[in-house]
Amino acid sequence: MAKTIKITQTRSAIGRLPKHKATLLGLGLRRIGHTVEREDTPAVRGMVNAVSYMVKVEE
C-alpha cells in the first residue's frame, strides 16, 4: 500500500489567487478544518507546496 499524508485546510480561500483556489479543490479541500488523505506522490507534494500557507500536513 502506498504511503499517505493527511492534509488539513487551515485558512480560507477567499481572496486568494484563482490558481490556489483550484489547487485546493484539486486536493479535495472545500472548507476550513476539512481533512483529506492523499497518496504521498511528487504531484500531491507540489500542490501542497503551492498552498502551504493555507494547509497543514501530517505524515
From Swiss-Prot:
<dbReference type="GO" id="GO:0006412">
    <property type="term" value="P:translation"/>
</dbReference>
<dbReference type="InterPro" id="IPR018038">
    <property type="entry name" value="Ribosomal_uL30_CS"/>
</dbReference>
<keyword id="KW-0687">Ribonucleoprotein</keyword>
<dbReference type="InterPro" id="IPR005996">
    <property type="entry name" value="Ribosomal_uL30_bac-type"/>
</dbReference>
<dbReference type="InterPro" id="IPR036919">
    <property type="entry name" value="Ribo_uL30_ferredoxin-like_sf"/>
</dbReference>
<protein>
    <recommendedName>
        <fullName>Large ribosomal subunit protein uL30</fullName>
    </recommendedName>
</protein>
<comment type="subunit">
    <text>Part of the 50S ribosomal subunit.</text>
</comment>
<keyword id="KW-0689">Ribosomal protein</keyword>
<comment type="similarity">
    <text>Belongs to the universal ribosomal protein uL30 family.</text>
</comment>
<dbReference type="Pfam" id="PF00327">
    <property type="entry name" value="Ribosomal_L30"/>
</dbReference>
<dbReference type="GO" id="GO:0003735">
    <property type="term" value="F:structural constituent of ribosome"/>
</dbReference>
<dbReference type="GO" id="GO:0022625">
    <property type="term" value="C:cytosolic large ribosomal subunit"/>
</dbReference>
<dbReference type="InterPro" id="IPR016082">
    <property type="entry name" value="Ribosomal_uL30_ferredoxin-like"/>
</dbReference>
